[in-house]
């Protein structure tokens, strides 16, 4: 039958109208959010869908991912931007029946299986019901998949269009089982539920099951009057993507393409077909035009408008506040009350009563009367302080209303303006003198220090002006916040922060640009005075840029969940959720995944992966790397299989790989979240998580809060506890860390030495070295250092250091800014003429070019985005504005260029200042209370044995004693005993938390344990099994009772004695002993003294077994030569590698010393052998790999618990280092290597005269040892070998005693080590003869 002879198809649509022929839209399409199943990236998919849309038809596309709606908002936004109509849906997992979603038993037959059902939102109510269905699938029905059942469909079917589904649907599966009557009954159930919104879905991918089922479905459609719809179950974009999709499925199932039994699609037809291809699959001669035309009509019916973009309405949560006030007024009340506490010397009662009185006068009689009526008639003179704050809040509302009515951008405050004018003219109110006198008698609340011996008029005037400046800043910020509609946000954040503080949960001083707000400081959201640190409010909230404020809040990471719990309890668990985040297939990992499933040799792909550049911490895309790296181009040109893998990886790169929970983001809704977004369960199965990512929840209007966990706050809390329990004077002198002095000499000395292990932000070897070179003298230096030590601005560190030390002057004339230097000098003074902060860009634009600070913030953002048209406009504004201030056009352009270049890496000063304070606090603690500092540090890191080992090593350098656990002295965690640190019982492996608590409880109740037998009799097997008892002995916890080997061998005796004692006690309790007039006593047997004590190495070995690290010593201490021969310690290896400036994809030789542990040997695919092992020194440990080329050579020396020197090749890998073992040098071999004298000289602090003295000392104590001099400046170093050997032990001692800027020590000649033992000539030997640039 030809097309023209085909019968007119039955068209059944909800509104009964007919479709136009020759139309088609894809309504069953999976995207990248069908995780590791959909290989269609949203933008590629929408672009192609638009291309295959029949001419004259509005492009439309449905998104129907498996079980979730993760990508709905992104899909909607991209589609609207690309002029494609978005249809939001999802393919639900259905278990038939009512309440069956809660059934967790495995499927026994088809009815208990999980089936597919295609659902589309017809309107916003339908969208909401999809959110509810998908959510409840996760929260109530999750069992392998997020499942819904017929009960949920009955509850939430309104506004939804449903299709009968693919081969995985209930109807089709029943047909495939030969149960035609059941399939028909199921079809009718759905038809009755959805009515005219139900369609029979027809697909044909050439599969035999479809050929069998489709005629039956067609017959039922015609018989029952149910419309048919043609779909293609798309999983990728184009037919050519089928193999890439097959590869993706293999990655998901961890299979290889060579595995014939792997899960795969049956054909390559699951792509976005054009109408012609669809009609070839479903010929019009057989199906008519109905299945195609219906797709277009359904697309017309689906009209969901999401509240995004300009239609977005913020869903601010409802916070209970006192009756009779608006949210804006409540914020004002809290701000005034808080500001008075923050600035008691300036924002005084007298000032505020004067301000209120003047404001009432400015209002006029009628309006003033109305305001006073709201306060119960109390005026500014008669009201109490709380009512005064309320009065000021009501007055603020009046001025804001007047400002809006007049169309003012910023609220005018006439009374404040007159007070400022009086202050400038010299007219001072009476209270100003009293306030200034009172301020002299108390600690300053600002950086302004008043001289108690002076009482002149000018000082009083300055004091009063500053008070007015504070009041002006508060009023300005309040007007901006309230006019932008965000008072609720500030109050909500302040509520949970103050709850945390009131419950002794540490909160950070601020983070991000929010620290620039005085209102936030007043209501205790932040703890940083923005005026003292010269922070800009406009960097945070800008009336020229309407966007939600965003406070990032740090909490003690151990108690962060308590704060989230408080918010859930306050607003309701159904209104609070964390936010999803999605991991994508990044370039390097994606290439390796594809290569694995294709069976490519790992080494080959690994080599390409390592050539992919990393910029600012982010890898290039595969396309960028291919264009930028000639070596990659060459390797792909020479290897067809590698090229194929690379191109498949390019197709898969960027696809969504997995969903997880965002580290900080929490949303709080005004109403139940599922009215707006779908949710799912977190990994614990308790809390709920939005299915959308952070950008999507913000786009749709939900309010996002950031609850960040900061380990350093846990550390500071732990330190406070230890300081208190160890009897220090800390609390008496300072109260807490917010009140320590910022001018402590010992703290700056510590940072100047680079002794910053464990100090927040200064922990790494690189930044510790930068701190040593900078030698900070003030908090501003610490703030700048953390901002500078990042890719990009790091290149300015040498200049900053030179200017800081007075070696180099700032010269704006020489730099080309003679006419703008009057402003630059002021703005860049604290950073020595170097732009470091984003706020400085804003200040320069404001001062030099006349921008408002709001406009300057827009300039800063434009520079960051590099929009060519916007930059052209901004340049013109800047140059013209600067010209009006007397800056020539060429200088204005040059200044604009400097700011533009800096904008790429400028740092947020508010964030840097807040974190700089925490840096200082931790450094101050280390400098002033080192024992407590280290005990707290070890406690918070106790679960990371590598970190504990590193810090124990640092403690030894500080001459602190870290002792093994002691059963009678140790607490649960690390504790201070005098000037020593005791290991906690929690650190002992095999000893559970409950056992530790029982031990401490027994010790508290019945006193110290007297012996091993006493411990066993009091606690015995009920609390500690034999393995736990052995761990206690091996850790050293029972050292007070005897030698460890003797204790181990006597354990059985002690357990038997304990059992005997228990039996005697039982008889005593029953009264049997007393019946015979006798009292039994079980005598404890002594330790087996005939057992030989452990050797030092044996003792250290069992100590490490029990604690995960060596405490009472280290095996390397007996082999000092090994440590001298190493390039660096294990924990410093990353920093050492960075200093070598190794090119991407290249390797660097190094020499490491340590104990060989955990050797694992295994065969390779090529038939050889390889090994992996751990190398551990006092600072930590790392894994090494020995490939087959080195294996035979080093295998005899791969013996566990053996000290050795290992020559390795290092290469950068995925943000870390991989170490490949090339050779192992034994102790005996090392004894043949001569030692050298190595002297590091700091040229910054060594004067030319002192260098002459150095030569004299060297001559006086000269020996014959080869000698190397390493001469250092802040930006580079050079190593020289002296022509004649002059080193000697005496010279080393004399040089170190005489010159603070010289560090002389013995070392092995690494040239000799590498030349003699390395399998090939080392690449780094030439560096000894030349200079090396610092990273």
Swiss-Prot record:
Record has Transferase as a keyword: yes
Keywords: Cytoplasm, DNA damage, DNA repair, DNA replication, DNA-directed DNA polymerase, Nucleotidyltransferase, Transferase
Record-linked Gene3D superfamilies: 1.10.150.870, Bacterial DNA polymerase III alpha subunit, thumb domain (1.10.10.1600), Metal-dependent hydrolases (3.20.20.140)
InterPro entries, sorted: DNA_pol3_alpha_NTPase_dom, DNA_pol3_alpha_thumb_dom, DNA_pol3_finger, DnaE2/DnaE/PolC, DNAPol_HHH, NA-bd_OB_tRNA, PHP_dom, Pol/His_phosphatase_N
GO CC terms, sorted: cytoplasm
Loss of function: phenotype: Essential, it cannot be deleted.
Subunit structure, as described in the record: DNA polymerase III contains a core (composed of alpha, epsilon and theta chains) that associates with a tau subunit. This core dimerizes to form the PolIII' complex. PolIII' associates with the gamma complex (composed of gamma, delta, delta', psi and chi chains) and with the beta chain to form the complete DNA polymerase III complex.
Protein family per UniProt: Belongs to the DNA polymerase type-C family. DnaE subfamily.
Name assigned to this protein: DNA polymerase III subunit alpha
Organism name: Deinococcus radiodurans (strain ATCC 13939 / DSM 20539 / JCM 16871 / CCUG 27074 / LMG 4051 / NBRC 15346 / NCIMB 9279 / VKM B-1422 / R1)
